[in-house]
Amino acid sequence: MRLAGFLMMAAAIPGLAEVSYVKDVQPIFNKVGCTSGPCHGGAKGKNGFKMSLRGYDPEFDFRAVMTDLSGRRINRTEPAQSLILLKPTMEIPHGGGVRLEQNSPYYKTILQWLSEGAAYGDPVSSQVTKLDVDPPEFFAQKPGPSQQLKVVAHYADGSSRDVTGLALYNSSIPTTAEISEDGVIKTLRKGEAAMLVRYEGRLSVINVTALSDKQGFQWKPVPEFNYIDTLVNEKMQRLHLLPSELTTDAEFLRRVSLDLTGLPPTPEEVRAFLNDKTENRKKRTAMIDKLMARPEFVNHWSVKWGDLLQVNRTKLGDKGMWAFRDWIREALAENKPYDKMVRELVTAKGSTFQNPPANFLRFTKEPKLAMETTTQLFLGVRMVCAQCHDHPFEKWTQNQYFSLAAFFAGVGTKPGSDSEEEIVFEKRDGAEVTHPKDGRVMTAKFLFGSEKSGVHEVGLRESLAEWLTSKDNPFFAQAMANRMWSYFFGHGIIDPVDDIRASNPPSNPKLLAALTKDFSDSNFDLKHLIRTIVSSRTYQLGFKPNEWNADDELNFSKALPRRLSAEELFDGVNIAAGTKVQLKELPEESKAQDFPDPHVGQGGFLDVFGRPERQTSCECERRSDVSLVQALNLLNGSTIADAIADSRGRVSKLLLGGKTDRQIVEELYLSSLNRMPETAELDYAQTYLGRGGSRAERAQDLLWALLNSNGFLFNR
C-alpha cells in the first residue's frame, strides 16, 4: 500500500491526535538504536525486519512497521500487545535485548501513537529546520566539571520543542570529554573535544575545552612572523599552552629542505648555512626562496600530485602515464594557478596522449566515481555515504549525490589510434544518471550556492568547473589550504583532510579561515600558500616539548616528528651513503622522486615504507606508519647494506682521502642527520673508530647506526 493510502486511513480514524510517526515515533526508534547499523538499520536488517540506516527514510520505516509481516507488528485492537512494544521490552524474546522500559516516556509515546490510530503525520510541517544547543560551547578551568546540554528542535511549521532526551550524542575524543545519552558532558582530562548533537537530520557541534589543573601558567609573548603565528598563539594562550623553542639552524635547514624538495641538505649546504651570520629570519627566508626555485621542488611536489591524480601505468598505459606526469611537472614549474589546473582536469576532452588532463577522466569514467573523486579531491567532501542514503553526519542527500553525478553523465571514451590511447568525448544522446529508488532521470545541480540547475550553454562539465573553482565556493580554497597545511605539520586543521564536514570541525577555525582567504586572494597561488606556511614561526618551532605543551598534538605548539616518506627515505639513504641509483627507464643518477609511478622499483624498499599503489585519490593510501617489516629492512635489508658498503660510496671515499677520525665522524653526521655531532657523540664515535680492526667496517657501522636513528628516519 502506498504512503498516501496510510495517510488516508489514519485521517479516517476518529479522534486522531497529536502523536505522529514522523515527528514522535521515528526519533524514538533512532534514539534507542533500532535504526543503527548493527540492528535493523543494517544492509539486510535483522531477523526479517529492515529499517533505513539511522532513520534517514522515515516513509520506508513507517511502511516496514505497518505492512511487513502482513501488518502483524502492530495490534490495532490491543495496542499494548503490538510486537513493536513487546519485543523491545523483552516481553517476548528479542535479539537486541531491552530497548524500552515499560511505562517509560518512550513506551508511552509509542503506545499513545498506536492507540490514536498510528498516523504518519505531516512530513512537511514535521521537518526539523534548525537545532539549537545550549550552551553553544563549554569551557572548564580544569578537568572534572560537567555540563547538561539543552537541545531544542525548530520545525517547519514554526513550532519548537525540547528534544534533549531524544537527541543522539557523540564525543570526538571520549578520553578528553565524554557525553551521556541524556546530553551530560563530563570533562576527563586537559584538552579539547567536539560534542556532536544529532536529531532528525540536523547536526550541531559543541566545542568542549578543559584546561589543566596545573597552576602558574603565564603567557610569554613571542615574535610573530605572519598571521599564522598570531592565530596559533591566540589559541595557545587561551588553552594555557606555551610554544616550544625555535628550531636550531640545522634543524630548520633539514626540515625545510625535506618538506620543500624531498631531499636533505648536503654537508656543504649545512656548513654554509650554519656559518652564515645573516640575521636569522632573513637567512631562513632566503633559504626558503632558494629551495622553492630548485627543480627538486617540482620533482617532490610532482610525487604528491601523482598520488592524488593516480598517475599509474596500469590505469593510463605507459604513454598516458608519462604524458600526465609531465603535465603535472610543467604545471608546477610554471606555478599554474590551482583553479586553472582543476578546470583543465574536470573539463578535459580529446586524446589522453595529446591532452594529458584527459587522463583524469580515464580512471573516473563512471559518473558516480568521477563525482566522488572530484568532490573528495577538490572540495575535501566525501559524498560516497550519500549514494545509498542521505549522509548520516552531513547535510548531503541521496538526491544531491545523483544530481551532482549527472554533470559527468555525458563523458564517454573511445579507443585512439594507439592501443593505449583513449579519446575523451561528450556523448550526444542517452547521457543521463537515474535515481536508484524510482528510476527518475536526475537533473545536474550544484551542491550549494546556486539555484540554477547547472545546465549551461558552455556544457555541463564546464559549468561544474566554474562553480567548483569559484571564490564563492567555501570548500574549494579551504580544502587545498587544509591539505597543504597537513603536508608541513603531519595533520590538517581538519583531519582527515579529505573529510570536511560539520561533524569534523577544525581545531583552529580562525586559522583555517585566514589561510583559505589568503589562498583565494592570491588567485590560488600554490607557491604563495607554501611560502606563507613555511615562513611562519609556527612552522619553525622545535619538536622538543616543554612542561606546558607536552601532551598537545592538535594546536601546533610544537613540531610533531613525521616519518620520512618512502621516497625521502630511499633518496636520503643513497645521498648519505654517496651512492647512485641506475634504472633502465630513467636517466642516470635518478632519484626516487623522479620515479613516474609505483611500477618503478615495485615490491622493494619503497613499497615496504608505504609508497601508494595510486589506486585512489585518498591521502590515506600513502602509509606513514612504522612496522616490524620496516624495522627488519632497516636493520639488515639490502638497500641500506649495499649503499653503505658501496666501494664508490661516501665511506670508501673518506677513507681513501685520508680523512681523520674526526673528519669522518663529522662528514657522516652531516650527510645523514644534517648537523654537526654533539661533543659527546663526537667523542664516542672517534673512540669507536679508533678501537682497531677494520676501520672501514667501523665507519660503515657508524653510518648504519645513524641511518637507523630517529634523527634520520623522522623529519622533526
Question: Language model features by range: what are they?
Answer:
Residues A577, K584-L586, K591-P596, G604-L628, ...:
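Long, His/Glu/Asp-enriched segments that create or flank divalent metal/ion-associated functional microenvironments
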